[in-house]
């Protein structure tokens, strides 16, 4: 390949790259005049001072529960799972109005033993009054490496039909 031909190849590749970036950037443009419907609610909490609910998260977005060790984060998360699985109001506080086409809940725990994860799920079942919820899939990932956990979480998210709610208890 001659010097000029090599130079032309590089310029062509740069031009392609610039064109692809331009197209991608344009596809991300937010049009202020476009009518965009609000996202569907994934979960919300009842306001103590009224009958109104405060949005905690919408479909397609991430929410994070953060707190000190032993501050009952897992308890709160299990209430959220109960709300998502049952579609009911949990402890007169939390609800998750998931539609039937987004009603599957996947729960990963990365810290607890299989025994303790099962106990947590049994508490959820007791709370919602259902023996075995058909829309809850639970996985204990403690024994796996972080890279294995990530692969399995991604796989489950990509391959669970009608997925509406994902919980990962114990991300570091």
Where do the PLM segments sit?
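The Walker A/P-loop phosphate-binding site
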Residues: 13-124, 131
